[in-house]
C-alpha cells in the first residue's frame, strides 16, 4: 500500500497500509532493511510514485480524513529531494484518485486510472468506499514544476490497482484490480509515448488477469509481480520488452503470494536510458 520511487542510488517507500506518514529508504547496492527518510504531509495509503534522479513525487492517496464521510481531503501531493533527507514538501497538485498506476520519463510523470476519492471532480465520486467510481483518465505532471498538471489521455478500461512500467520514452499500463468499485480483473496492457499526449494503444496481455501488484522496470524491460487475480493473491512474475508490443512472458515466482505493494528500480525510465 506504499508509494515507491527511486533514483540510481536509493529506493524510497512512502505511506502504507492502515494509513502511515513515514517515508523509508534503502540503498540498492546493499542488502538490509529500510532507514528513516522523513514523513509525508499526512497519513496516506495507495499513493502513486514517480521520480527522476533528483526528485520523487507521491500523490493520489487514500487519506486519514477519507475514512469519515463525506470525503473532505484536499488531495495532497508531496515531493522529496533524494539528496536531502527530511519531510516531504507540498508539490501543489490536487489528485482526485487513489490506487492509480504511474509511469514517467526524466521530465514528466503520468498517473493513470484509479478510484475517485471525493465528489466534485470529473467522473463523480461517492462518500462510500465500496461505491466510489473507477476512472479512465490519465493526468501528467512536469517533475521540475510545482502546482501544474494537465489531462494526458484516457485508458480503454476504468479501474484502480493497475501497474505501470516505463522506459525514458514509453510507458505501459498493465492489469486492473477487482477489489470493490464494480470492476473485475483484466490482463490488458496498453502503452503511450510519454512525450506525446493522447490515448494509449494496445500492447498485449499479461499472463494472468490481475491487479494490485508491484511493478518495476529498466530502460528495456518491465516486470509485473504478484497482485490479486479472480482466485486470490498470486506470486506470478511476468515481463515485457517495453520497446516492442506483445504478450507478457513468465519470469518466475515471488517467494510468497503478495498484493497491494509497490516496486522500484535504479534503472527505470525516469533516470534515462
Question: Where do the protein language model's features map onto the residues?
Answer:
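Polar, enzyme-active/binding microenvironments
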Residues: 1-273
Amino acid at each position: 500500500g506504499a508509494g515507491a520511487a527511486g533514483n540510481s542510488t536509493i529506493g524510497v517507500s512512502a505511506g502504507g497500509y492502515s494509513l502511515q506518514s513515514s517515508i523509508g529508504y534503502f540503498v540498492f547496492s546493499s542488502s538490509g532493511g529500510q532507514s528513516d527518510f522523513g514523513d509525508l504531509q499526512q497519513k496516506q495509503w495507495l499513493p502513486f510514485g514517480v521520480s527522476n534522479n533528483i526528485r520523487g513525487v507521491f500523490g493520489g492517496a487514500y487519506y486519514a480524513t477519507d475514512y469519515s464521510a463525506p470525503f473532505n481531503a484536499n488531495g495532497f501531493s508531496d515531493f522529496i529531494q533524494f539528496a536531502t533527507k527530511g519531510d516531504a514538501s507540498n508539490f501543489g497538485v490536487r489528485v482526485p484518485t487513489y490506487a492509480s498506476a504511474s509511469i514517467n520519463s526524466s521530465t514528466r510523470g503520468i498517473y493513470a486510472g484509479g478510484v475517485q476519492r471525493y465528489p466534485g471532480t470529473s467522473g463523480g465520486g461517492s462518500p462510500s468506499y465500496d461505491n466510489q467510481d473507477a476512472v479512465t483518465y490519465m493526468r501528467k505532471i512536469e517533475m521540475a514544476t510545482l502546482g501544474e498538471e494537465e489531462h494526458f489521455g484516457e485508458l480503454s478500461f476504468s479501474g484502480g490497482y493497475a501497474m505501470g512500467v516505463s522506459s525514458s520514452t514509453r510507458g505501459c499500463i498493465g492489469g486492473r484490480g477487482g477489489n470493490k468499485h464494480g470492476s473485475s480483473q483484466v490482463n490488458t496492457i496498453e502503452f503511450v509515448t510519454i512525450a506525446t499526449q493522447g490515448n494509449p494503444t494496445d500492447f498485449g496481455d499479461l499472463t494472468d488477469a490481475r491487479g494490485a501488484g508491484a511493478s518495476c522496470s529498466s530502460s528495456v524491460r518491465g516486470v509485473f509481480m504478484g497482485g490479486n487475480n479472480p482466485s486470490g493473491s498470486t506470486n506470478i512474475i511476468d515481463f515485457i520488452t517495453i520497446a516492442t508490443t506483445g504478450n507478457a512472458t513468465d519470469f518466475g515466482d515471488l517467494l510468497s503470494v503478495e498484493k497491494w505493494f509497490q516496486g522500484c528500480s535504479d534503472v527505470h525510465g525516469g533516470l534515462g536510458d
